[in-house]
Amino acid sequence: EGNWYYVNGKGDLLLGAQTIDNVKVYFDTKGVQYKGHFAPDHHYYDKDTGALVTDRLVKDGSKESYVDKEGKIYNGVKDLGGIQYYFRDGEKVKGDFDYSNSNLYYYDKETGALVTGKYFQHKNNWYFANGNGKILTGKQVIDGKHVYFYNDGYNYGKKGIQAKDKLVILNGKTYYYLPDSGNRAENVTLTVNHVTYYFDNDGVGHILR
């Protein structure tokens, strides 16, 4: 069936972790050599040679992982070829955030690469990652446009979401961010939630009626 085994000088099948000709390999309980998969010892063995893999990105089914210089599963941020990735629970993160510190970062849903210097969409919400990948929060000016991203340190589910079609009160002043672009309303009269405002040149809303 295309399986590989190893019989020692006594005619016994080798089982478990073994070193043969200075190469670390692994055999299951029936003597079948592990290739292209993680073994019960949590190490990955090469799909062609069956040798223990170290310091490399590996794939087992749909799961992508990184193993360190000792062959152990790596967790955390890792730079590979100048591209930053993030591994959580032994797997490359794709289409999700790194919540591990006070700053928020997002990793591309297709490649797993850190998203930098652009707007991106996640679960129908828009965010912006700066040149270092940090998700922006609060009042920002991007491409000359005044925009706002929620900054809720107690609710990571909302942190960094761009305000669109929303009234936002900051330091006692009311601002409105437009539905499509998310740009701040300026020099315009609008009715929002049945209240009519005039938003001045600085975007501050004044109730008219």
PLM feature spans:
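Extracellular adhesion/carbohydrate-binding repeat motifs centered on closely spaced tryptophans
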Residues: 1-209
